[in-house]
């Protein structure tokens, strides 16, 4: 659920998916979005031999339909400098649909994805921890549900009018 560009770094998720498939994990990846990296990502999936495990959906407008098919939102951004500052809409949307997130900890994401509560925020490049987090959520659907609901509540709290006002005023009082 994002632009398919180098900052969103879906190519990193394809590498992780290959490792998961090689371990026999029951995984599929739905890539939602359009962008300059689409052809490269399709070629990478084919080169890795995982094209049967990856579906490229293009732009998705029906978020309800999309999230009915998604158990976990995986997110592998690679933000350098000021690129991609802040939390992506995909994480907010996952929260609204009670979907836990496994993500690299980049650009303030840890404010939304709290490891062990609303999903897992993994240090950038730690593929083993990323795989372990996904595996935990696959094996424990009740935990997946709890984390999804916790993310929903957290999104509602952080995006409330009162919280936006409070943080805006705090920024001006610095």
Please identify what each model-predicted range represents.
Residues 37, 51-60, 66:
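Active-site donor-binding acidic/aromatic loop of nucleotide-activated sugar
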Residues 64, 88-96, 110-111:
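Short alpha-helical segment that forms part of, or immediately flanks, the ligand-binding pocket
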Residues 68-83, 99-100:
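Acidic donor-binding loop of glycosyltransferase active sites
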Residues 115-116, 120-127, 136-141:
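Conserved acidic donor-binding segment of nucleotide-sugar-dependent glycosyltransferases
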């Amino acid at each position: 659920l994002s632009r398919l560009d180098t900052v969103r770094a879906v190519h990193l998720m394809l590498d992780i998916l290959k490792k998961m498939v090689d371990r026999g994990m029951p995984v599929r990846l739905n890539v939602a979005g359009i962008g300059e990296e689409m052809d490269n990502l399709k070629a990478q999936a084919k080169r890795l031999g995982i094209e049967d495990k990856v579906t490229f959906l293009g732009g998705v407008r029906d978020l309800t339909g999309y999230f009915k098919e998604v158990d976990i939102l995986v997110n592998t951004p690679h933000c350098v400098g000021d690129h991609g500052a802040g939390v992506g809409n995909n994480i907010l949307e996952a929260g609204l649909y009670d979907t836990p997130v496994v993500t690299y900890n980049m650009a303030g994401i840890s404010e939304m994805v709290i490891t062990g509560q609303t999903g897992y925020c993994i240090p950038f490049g730690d593929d083993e921890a990323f795989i372990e987090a996904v595996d935990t959520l696959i094996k424990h659907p009740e935990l997946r549900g709890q984390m999804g609901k916790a993310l929903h509540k957290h999104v509602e709290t952080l995006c409330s009018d009162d919280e936006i006002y409070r943080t805006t005023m705090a920024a001006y009082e610095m």
